Amino acid sequence: NLKLTVDEKERLELKEYFISNTRIPSKYITLLDLAYDGNANRDFEIVTAELFKDIFKLQSKHMGGTRKPDILIWTDKFGVIADTKAYSKGYKKNISEADKMVRYVNENTNRNKVDNTNEWWNSFDSRIPKDAYYFLWISSEFVGKFDEQLTETSSRTGRNGASINVYQLLRGADLVQKSKFNIHDLPNLMQNNEIKFI
């Protein structure tokens, strides 16, 4: 007899919703599981990067590794430094993770090899305006005072950003596929709060 927790049951219902009502490939619907699996961080990063490329039709690159952001997302008009975190109980404010994002945003702004010899920022399109870079956290859900992490990161970098939970990420993918959201409007959603499509 399969005993499901309330959370697992809700996720199963969400998966069924996306399978029945969207054209999102099942590979991406598995993000609903990966986002809650603390042992699946790398898979979560890789599949999220592919979702941005395949469904959102943005340029994206999974970076991972030491002293690099998890994912870069861009067009020739804007760039996003994204950090993914798979947490079973949600992502709450975390000073060391905020410090890491601040470092990435500032490294991208300054673009000095002395700051980081791997020069990961060179993956971005060179045509992106200097003031059109944003930061983004992606996780299962955001709990506690995570909004403080957004406002503090913004005030420390002079850049805007956002967070998005995995359900909203898939809602956004569905809206893009149905031509109900123009992905070039993504920068308008970077208001230092959690993105909610619906």
Model-inferred region functions:
Residues 11-197:
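Catalytic core segments in nucleotide and nucleic-acid processing enzymes
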Residues 1-9:
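Nuclease-adjacent, charged terminal/linker segments that flank catalytic cores
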